Amino acid sequence: MKPTAEILASIIEEVRPLTGQGKVADYIPALAKVPSEKLGIAVFTNQGEVISAGDAQEGFSIQSISKVLSLTLAMGLYQPNELWSRVGKEPSGQAFNSLIQLEMEHGIPRNPFINAGAIVVCDMLQSRLSAPRQRLLEFVRQLSGEPLIAYDKVVAASEMMHSDRNAAIAYLMRSFGNFHNEVIPVLHNYFHACALKMSCVELAKTFSYLANKGVSVVTGETVITPTQSKQTNALLATCGLYDGAGEFAYRVGMPGKSGVGGGIIAVVPGEMTIAVWSPALDQSGNSLAGTRALELLAQRIGRSIF
């Protein structure tokens, strides 16, 4: 079955009670103010059709979903052996901001979708781009077809003021020789990426290349190679939801990436990209109602990569 506006609307109503459960991210003050009852879902098909329900047009802080965009940019700037010598491809099983594993594994992050891995990727972008922050913004605007997408400066500043742990991660990696630039400018870029403000519709359109063998459905241009697209989806399926990746694969069965702003993107290769948003999080830092919405959608349209 294909997704329809009626299916999405019924899912929104069914999962709405879950918005009262879970907890909005409060360690970033600007995120703590977002109303927990917000709930949206959008589907963007490989034919270019948008289907949505709930608060799908409202912008929110995409947070760790941006890690996929940073990795995509890095894939175009580095040879595979260069990229994957500095960050791994394995699930971590630890909290997304863990220092212990990083110390044990000599400054090489487990994967690009935990904080340490994404910070290394931002360090790599800093080495090859004269203005990485501007390049990322242009990249997102191009992929989404939305020229007004911007960074939420309040969120970025809020994160920078509470950046001790991420700075510790960066300095620890530098002590192992796996960080090549000044820490503070790279962290500024990292926090700005996390502070991209986008809606479910914009996110679903942005990541269409992952459902279309590396070619953007919006622009028709090649973003990454078919092999890189397949590899990115494999990483999303195993590492995209922090230490809740196994649970998500079991319940939803799609490659996905979450953020503590309450957003999740999911990919049905060859068919569509999906984005959901609900700010209240489970214990792994993933959207509680958003995960359930994706689970119901997967069941109702009969889609899974497994």
Swiss-Prot record:
Molecular function via GO: glutaminase activity
Entry-linked Pfam families: Glutaminase (PF04960)
InterPro entries associated with the record: Beta-lactam/transpept-like, Glutaminase
Domain of life of the organism encoding this protein: Bacteria
Catalytic reaction list: L-glutamine + H2O = L-glutamate + NH4(+)
EC number(s) per entry: 3.5.1.2
One BP term from GO: glutamine catabolic process
Keyword annotations from UniProtKB, A to Z: Hydrolase
Broadest EC class assigned to this enzyme: hydrolase
Annotated positions binding substrate: 64, 115, 159, 166, 190, 242, 260
Family: Belongs to the glutaminase family.
Subunit structure and binding partners: Homotetramer.
Protein's UniProt name: Glutaminase
Annotated organism of origin: Vibrio cholerae serotype O1 (strain ATCC 39541 / Classical Ogawa 395 / O395)
Phylogenetic placement of the source organism: Bacteria, Pseudomonadati, Pseudomonadota, Gammaproteobacteria, Vibrionales
